Design a protein with these regions (language model features):
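Short, well-ordered beta-strand segments in beta-rich or mixed alpha/beta enzyme
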Residues: 5-9, 45-68
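An amphipathic, aromatic/His-enriched active-site/gating alpha helix that lines ligand/cofactor pockets
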Residues: 59-89
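A short linear hydrophobic-aromatic micro-motif
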Residues: 38-44, 80-81
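Short S/T/G/P-rich N-terminal loop/turn motif that feeds into the first structured element of a domain
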Residues: 1-37, 47-50, 85-97
């Protein structure tokens, strides 16, 4: 399945209460599991820099990936940027010989 990376920058309101942030994470994760059962979550990272979180997941197609991102954004607590990712060994196949 294709791999997607979502970078999320939280709003200041989202980080005011750590308990609320933990609750929000559980709610979003449950929503994704319920509405996108075919998605395989690979990793979640808190990151330093202009973004607060990096999520890596596999989805069967870009429509499903877009649905995951729309679920994340629907809670109104962050801005996202989404990338597709390709394992290096697959990328090497497309390099000129």
């Amino acid at each position: 399945m294709p791999t997607y990376i979502v970078l999320t920058r939280l709003t200041p309101e989202a980080v005011k209460t750590p308990g609320e942030l933990k609750r929000l994470e559980r709610v979003v994760a449950d929503h994704v599991r319920k509405d996108c059962p075919q998605v395989k979550w690979v990793a979640n990272y808190a990151i330093l820099g202009p973004y607060d979180y990096m999520d890596i997941f596999e989805a069967p197609d870009e429509t499903t990936a877009a649905k995951v991102v729309m679920i994340i954004r629907s809670y109104g607590h962050g801005q996202t940027e989404t990338w597709t990712a390709m394992p290096w060994e697959r990328f090497e196949i497309v390099l000129p010989h």
